[in-house]
């Protein structure tokens, strides 16, 4: 067990303590030196640590630095076993050249001559060593002249000043002292320097974010309290004059950048995954042997997630959710449905054109049938003549109007023509002072009207069949008017009878007055009333109502009830079927 112990002083510097002799030393004892350290020492290198704990290696002679262990040509025996009186060192352009006692010298040349030939006059290699007290002022002056501020890290000082300023190497074996001087310099900056740094916020932000980038422990999810602990010893945080709010905002801006980068990375990954998923699903859906689409449940049970080895083998699919897969499935299905719908619309458009052509051909057929279609023509009249015609057969099963619809449209046109001619005929009869004789039969009346119309020039182009239909319409119209007139007269009479009954009720029921024993007595009593006079000469009707009237009855008579029903019924429009099937 070693008698040496490693310890640290108040400043954090490492020293070594001998438990037997009770002595301490800054130099590491030989007993504690590892093989790696021996190798470094024998080749003129030393190991040190930066402020954030990263190990680096430097050569105080050549002023070289490296983050990795340098590669040496061969291992050197431990220092204790070396024979210093047989070794001489020389540096040429930073490379070590060793001459040992075993190496052969050229005749006539001495070691001193060779050392003189390969002497290196670089200022970095020929720095006069100083004590720490002597070097402190010049070291701080070096920092000031190079405009070092709190935005610098100690590793930057090593890499930049250590390679170009000899003052950095005045004390070459104590990097902790140099870091101490750096901290002291930052603490003792002048007011002007602090004000200048305070105004250079952009410079601070750039350096602060660079420091955050170099810290591998700060992630996009790191919060400010955690970050403060991680960067507490960083000079830019510890000695910066920038307020805490600006530091925190700069940190947040950096974190926002990391978050955006993370999101963008995830977005790119997901975009790639969705693209590959689309190709994967297209291959499944479009190559399916089924006549219908693969349902979502079938897809879920056999082709995606842990149900499919092929799906699980794609590492990009790991970022996809059920919702992502469902959305892509719906997009593909909708695309296929839209394609089918477009094809169906194209087919409908072609069929629409064919349907229109078929209807036009059938209309031509209706104009060519052997029997001329009139206002009273029925479907059964023309069907035998068209049932075998291709123009009729091509109409079967078509969209839009059917053959019957087109036929009825044709008949309606003829009816409208007859209706218009009937109005002209009616005016002609008025102009000719034609008198209707109710004693004549409809047939005689028809013959008389036809003679009048045939002699009128307005009907020269109207054929006899149409004139017959026009006259039939006139006779029917007159008969309907006569029937309407009679119906109105009957309704008015029934109303008068009802009003007379109400008169009797008011006179003999509500007043309590006894009903006269005879109609003659009642006639004298009621003769001046309007209801009595309204019946005119219909004395028999008045007598019948009087005899049927009973004073104790308050309900309307049967005749009045019938009159009301007749009146109500007469106001209703008689409905007929829209299409009468006559075959």
UniProtKB/Swiss-Prot annotation:
It holds the Pfam family FF. One of its GO terms (cellular component) is spliceosomal complex. InterPro entries: FF_domain, FF_domain_sf, Prp40-like, WW_dom, WW_dom_sf. The modification Phosphothreonine is found at residue 576. GO terms for molecular function: RNA binding. GO terms for biological process: mRNA 5'-splice site recognition; mRNA splicing, via spliceosome. Changing residue 344 to A: Wild-type growth at 36 degrees Celsius. Keywords: mRNA processing, mRNA splicing, Nucleus, Phosphoprotein, Repeat, Ribonucleoprotein. SUPFAM superfamilies: FF domain, WW domain. Signal peptide: none annotated. It is found in: Nucleus. Residues 132-188, 201-257, 262-332, 354-413, 427-488, 491-552 form the FF domain. The WW and FF domains bind to the phosphorylated carboxy-terminal domain of RPB1. Belongs to the PRPF40 family. Required for pre-spliceosome formation, which is the first step of pre-mRNA splicing. This protein is associated with snRNP U1. Two commitment complexes, CC1 and CC2, have been defined in yeast. CC1 is a basal complex dependent only on the 5' splice site. CC2 is a complex of lower mobility and is dependent on a branchpoint as well as a 5' splice site region. This protein is involved in CC2 formation where it binds to the branchpoint binding protein MSL5, bridging the U1 snRNP-associated 5' splice site and the MSL5-associated branch point 3' intron splice site. Interacts with CRM1, MSL5, PRP8, and the RNA polymerase II largest subunit (RPB1). MSL5, MUD2 and PRP40 interact to form the commitment complex 2 (CC2), a precursor of mature spliceosomes. This is Pre-mRNA-processing protein PRP40. It comes from Saccharomyces cerevisiae (strain ATCC 204508 / S288c) (Baker's yeast).
